[in-house]
Design a protein with these regions (language model features):
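Core SAM-dependent methyltransferase catalytic element
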Residues: 155-173
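Conserved SAM-binding motif I beta-strand of class I
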Residues: 48-53
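S-adenosyl-L-methionine
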Residues: 54-86, 91
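Conserved SAM-binding loop of SAM-dependent methyltransferases across substrates and taxa
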Residues: 35-46
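Class I SAM-dependent transferase core
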Residues: 1-23, 61-64
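C-terminal substrate-binding/active-site "lid" region of AdoMet-derived donor-dependent transferases
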Residues: 108-161
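A short, conserved alpha-helix within the catalytic core of class I
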Residues: 99-107
Length: 173
């Protein structure tokens, strides 16, 4: 299935998950789960994962990607999900920018230990940084540019993938 905005490139996912710092026994959330590839990787360590997306195609794709894993897949707005009763979320990955400031606020208020936002737009990265700073949870931001090799006339050349901003927040409360 082709889900707009995904899947997250493996190299970007590796750095994002390192920053997220999922621990054994954690309850995690992939908010704006897209294809479910990040959800699947988080589920390898976390004891339980919420995967939330408002797009029907994303939910369908995540169900396929995460079959048999400890993942609860929810179709709907992230802010609606966070506003209703759920297990306390230890770490959250945000792959989408819909209602970003409100989502970050809800996660910070809940006491989510670690939050990672991936953004391809500068404006989204700025909003994430500004919101995290206002909430007192901003840790750091990365601008990641990855290039992959490919063969060209029996030689090796590199082709860049789109750069990504990785914004990390930690809640010490």
């Amino acid at each position: 299935m082709n889900v707009p905005g995904g899947p997250t490139p493996a190299e970007v996912m590796a750095v994002s998950l390192l920053k997220l710092g999922v621990r054994s026994g954690d309850v995690a959330a992939d908010l704006g789960c897209g294809t479910g590839t990040v959800t699947r990787e988080i589920a390898k360590t976390a004891s339980y994962v919420y995967a939330v997306d408002a797009r029907e195609i994303a939910v369908s794709c995540t169900k396929e990607t995460c079959a048999g894993l400890p993942v609860e897949i929810i179709e709907g707005e992230v802010t609606d999900f966070l506003s209703r009763p759920h297990r306390k979320i230890d770490c959250a990955f945000l792959g989408g920018s819909r209602n970003l400031a409100e989502t970050l606020t809800l996660l910070a208020e809940e006491g989510t230990r670690s939050i990672v936002v991936n953004a391809v737009l500068l404006e989204t990265a700025c909003l994430a940084i500004e919101t995290m700073k206002r909430l007192g949870i901003f840790s750091d931001a990365l601008h990641l540019q990855v290039s992959r090799s490919y063969e060209l006339t029996k030689r090796t050349m590199f082709k860049p993938i789109n750069p990504v901003y990785i914004i990390h927040g930690e809640n010490t409360c």
